[in-house]
Amino acid sequence: MTERADTHVVLYDLGSSSADLIAAMCLGHMRVTVLEPDQADADRVRDVLQRRLPGAGFTVSTRLPEGCDVFICHASDAQMAPPASLVAVLDGPEALATAPEPDRSVAMDVLDPRFAEVAFGNAPDTTRARATRFLAKLNTGFAVTTRGHGFWGNRLQDAAISFVDRLLLIGITPWELDEALEDAGFAQGLLKSQDHIGLDVAFARRRASGTDLLVADRMVHEGRLGRSVGVGWYRYPGGGGAVIDPLMEDMIVEEARFAGIDPVPMTDAAAADAVIAGIINAAAGMLQDGMTTDGVDALAFYKLGLPDLTARAKQIGESGLRNRLTALQAVDATLWCPSPSLGLIFGS
């Protein structure tokens, strides 16, 4: 099936987390249907998306169309795809092993359309070409993921939030850490970024992998899902900009006390350096899996807002980074354990 000029894309049961993707598809002159099987969910998602994307041309529906060109969904919903459509599952390369129709399926991380990851699995050349044409219409660069569990961009995001969650528990506040991260070169604090994405997105990945985070998980359980609902790491009164929420500090202190985690003296700048060291350490595994340094830098920039990751690593130096990671093991021995692949960042 060749995509028409007005490529029709269906987003199946993705909620408001697809707002950035919808905006990019509208700019690419695609016809977008946001399909929410539950009427109450459809009404809620329509309200959120209309507020976030005023004037964007998309349809919210509860009815599955007879056909479409591209069907984007979670792997568990792939069987809902209309015949002959390209099926793009968001869960990661491993989801292709159980795809109902692997010949027309790819795995694609495209919710942040500035830079995508795609895994083709065993799809034929015709399916690969369709996926590539779709990404071209989005006007996005992309990296091809050939192996590994999950998309590397998501794994970097999840690792970064794990570092942040632990640092909050030892006494750093969310807004102080975000400010320090921006001072260190991040385009936006990681917690503000998570509010924009929606905390439920990473939470779903953690549930699937059996990973728990004390603060971030509690926030989701309490309905602090991010900007789309008006409260996450920050509050967004009237749908406006981020405002510090003093209740967050009380929640973090309570979680630390329950877990028996004592405060650790650390400056905000040192906390930001700890996050960056952890990200570099996590990124080393990407090189082991065949990613290029350019791909590593692109994913760190577009998924975390951190430019020039490999250059930052080389500026610290391999010995300096290992020493930094070793010292941070006093905060968490597992999170900051030096990767066996760390030397690849430095060409060793």
Where are these regions (language model features)?
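N-terminal glycine-rich phosphate-binding loop for ADP-containing cofactors
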Residues: 1-348
